[in-house]
Every structure is written in C-alpha cells, then in structure tokens.
C-alpha cells in the first residue's frame, strides 16, 4: 500500500529535486501532497522547467496526516524556514520518527527545526557549516541515511541515490 508523502515547496525550488523524486515516488505507488502557504497557486522552479500546483495550505494540514516528508532544495527551504508553521510541521516528522527526505538546501528547514543535533547528514556545500553548527555530523557523500529516518543528499547529481534510499526507507 502506498504511503502519503507531504512535500513542502515554494517558489524557486530546484526543479529536478522535486520532479525526479516525485516521479519515483508516484511510480512506486505513493501519493504526494504539495504544501505551501496558499492552496491552488502555482509555484515555479528556479530553472524554469517545473511548475507545481499547490495541493494544500500549511494551515490545513497536520503531520499526522502523512507518512513521510520530502523537502526539495533550491531557494524554497530558505524561504519556508522563515515561517514557523513550516518549521513546526517539519519538526513534527522528526519528533514522530517519520521518514524525512531532504536534498541540497532541504536541510535548512531541519536546522531551524533544531532536528539535526546528533544526526549524520549531508547537504549542499554552502549549508554544511550551518548543519554542523546545528549539531549534525556532516559527511560529504551522495546520500546519507540516518537512524532509518532521515535521508539527505547534496545536489541534483545525487538524485538517483537519494531516490533509491528514500524508496527503500518507505518500504520498511
């Protein structure tokens, strides 16, 4: 049976870091719900190749409605972490030990959620010091799986490994 995956997303996400995992999750039978501030609006990726219609407002969802969380990178996570509703939503997944998949700049939301302390993780080069300052054991690998809950990757080049490990975790 497919899992329900929340996707937190806003303008200027990294196109392929949403489209490729979304495609892989859907092909595996999972259901995605794109969450932003406003339901029904269209958000565009920073490369201009992806446009996504928002399925739900952050005000209308609860982490208990979902089995996992996807945080694509780009500029989206930095914008979302300025809104405490998204920070608390993200934190709830970590607290409840539900799978969280964060690629590139995605861990920025985890930093603000104070959810990286003691975790092994990776992310885009420019946020690794921030991740370390948040208590993460940061490694430079294409994909890191921590405590059968958190999957992180560095860049779009890592998407195949990111998808593989994320899908494997959803099967557990």
Swiss-Prot record:
Disruption phenotype: When combined with a yraA disruption shows significantly reduced growth in the presence of formaldehye and methylglyoxal. Induction: By heat shock, salt stress, oxidative stress, glucose limitation and oxygen limitation. PROSITE patterns: PEPTIDASE_C56_PFPI (PS51276). Residues 3-171 form the PfpI endopeptidase domain. Its EC number is 3.2.-.-. It holds the Pfam family DJ-1_PfpI. The keyword Protease applies. Keywords: Hydrolase, Protease, Stress response. One of its GO terms (molecular function) is peptidase activity. One of its GO terms (biological process) is proteolysis. CDD domains: GATase1_PfpI_like. The active site is at 104 (nucleophile), 105. SUPFAM superfamilies: Class I glutamine amidotransferase-like. Belongs to the peptidase C56 family. Functions in the protection against aldehyde-stress, possibly by degrading damaged proteins. This is General stress protein 18. It comes from Bacillus subtilis (strain 168). The gene is yfkM.
């Amino acid at each position: 049976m497919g899992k329900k995956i929340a996707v937190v997303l806003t303008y200027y996400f990294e196109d392929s870091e949403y489209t490729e995992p979304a495609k892989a999750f859907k092909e595996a039978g999972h259901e995605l719900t794109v969450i932003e501030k406003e339901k029904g609006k269209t958000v565009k990726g920073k490369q201009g190749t992806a446009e996504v219609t928002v399925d739900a407002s952050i005000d209308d969802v609860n982490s208990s409605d979902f089995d996992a969380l996807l945080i694509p990178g780009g500029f989206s996570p930095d914008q979302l972490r300025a809104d405490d509703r998204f920070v608390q939503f993200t934190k709830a997944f970590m607290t409840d030990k539900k799978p969280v998949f964060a690629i590139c700049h995605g861990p920025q939301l985890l930093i603000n959620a104070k959810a990286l302390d003691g975790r092994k993780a990776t992310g885009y080069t420019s946020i690794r010091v921030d991740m370390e300052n948040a208590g993460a054991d940061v490694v430079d690998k294409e994909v890191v799986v921590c405590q059968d809950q958190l999957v992180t990757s560095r860049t779009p080049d890592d998407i195949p490994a990111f998808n593989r490990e994320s899908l494997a975790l959803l099967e557990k």
